[in-house]
Amino acid sequence: PDTSISPAAYIQSGYARFSHRNEQAEPGYYSVVFDNGIKTELSVTNRCGIHYYQYPANSAHALTIDLTTARNWDRTTETSIRKVNSRTLEGYRKSQGWANDQRVYFIIEFSQDCEVLAGYKKFSPLENGQKITDKGCYLYVDFGQKTNKILAIPKER
């Protein structure tokens, strides 16, 4: 994948763990409940991916967006993420791998406003989370504490 979006409680917590007993997979759909109680559902249309995240009550509601990770022979050459408004991000990832100049562009629309947006490049935080462009960008998006609300990307189900 060219973009990695993951639910997170806090940026320092690292990867969420899960048991295969808590997974469901079929063509075009995947669901898992992580050990931290976050339920994740992923689905697709012909042109986009749809994510649903349901967080435990009174927990932080956050996502990480990682454009730095490369798989197999792929090498990231440039990435960018920009906050368009309180619910929309746009960006791109350029890489070399199966194509010499592969470009993936994206728009992410949330069903809730972002309360905190922290950008990182080369694991150093940026002071201004409005736009990041670098060889490798990583974004932490915090939606604050909600009461068991579902965060959807995009908001239509």
Where do the language-model regions lie?
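Beta-sandwich/jelly-roll carbohydrate-recognition scaffolds of carbohydrate-active enzymes
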Residues: P1-R157
